Amino acid sequence: MLILLDQDGVLADFEHAFIDAWRKRHPDIEPVAFEERKSFHIREDYAPELRGLAEAIYTAPGFIRDLPPVPGAVEAFRELLALGMDVRICSSPLMQFENCVAEKYLWVERHLGRDATQRLILTRDKTLVQGDLLIDDRPVITGAARPRWRHIIYDAPYNRDQTDRPRLDWRNWRNVLAGELYRSDA
């Protein structure tokens, strides 16, 4: 089985790192709490006059590279490989890609090992990537093609209105994926 894992928000803890960076840069302005998030794009959860401040954080040199792993993500990645799954990291770089692209590779190397950089797929359109499952926190994924993969939503406050697909986090991933493996054998 070919499993595609999104990077930001699934493997790398973008959300909490953003909040920490916001508090350091703007201690006088309260950040939007993770549980209060409504939009996949973090800047859209801020008032228009604050969106530039938000964007400056996640496009800053070192931000993507220095993201901590989502708790349980590295262990799940390694366990999936040990189970014989073909696991790839499928990530969309930011439109402001100057720092992001290289830093995604550096993040993978730091947390998953140099060999894992061979498993990194960067694309603006995930529908063009082949796979059986895509685990992604983006609630709706559209593009040029009808994807072959089944979208499993990685749980986040901004995607909880989507109830038509399986949902997982790194605490329940074994149960959710066991159901998907059974489903693929049918």
Curated annotation (Swiss-Prot):
Enzyme class: hydrolase
Keywords: Hydrolase, Magnesium, Metal-binding
Catalytic machinery residues: 6, 8
Domain of life the protein comes from: Bacteria
InterPro entries per UniProt: 5'(3')-deoxyribonucleotidase (IPR010708), HAD-like_sf (IPR036412), HAD_sf (IPR023214)
Record's keyword annotation contains Magnesium: yes
Residues engaged in binding Mg(2+): 6, 8, 137
Family matches, as CDD domains: HAD_5-3dNT
Pfam families listed in its UniProt record: NT5C (PF06941)
Cofactor dependency: Mg(2+)
EC number, as in UniProt: 3.1.3.-
Listed GO MF terms: 5'-nucleotidase activity; metal ion binding
Any single GO BP term: pyrimidine deoxyribonucleotide catabolic process
Function: Dephosphorylates the 5' and 2'(3')-phosphates of deoxyribonucleotides.
PANTHER family: 5'(3')-DEOXYRIBONUCLEOTIDASE (PTHR16504:SF4)
Similarity comment: Belongs to the 5'(3')-deoxyribonucleotidase family.
Protein name: Putative 5'(3')-deoxyribonucleotidase
Organism: Bordetella pertussis (strain Tohama I / ATCC BAA-589 / NCTC 13251)
Native organism taxonomy: Bacteria, Pseudomonadati, Pseudomonadota, Betaproteobacteria, Burkholderiales
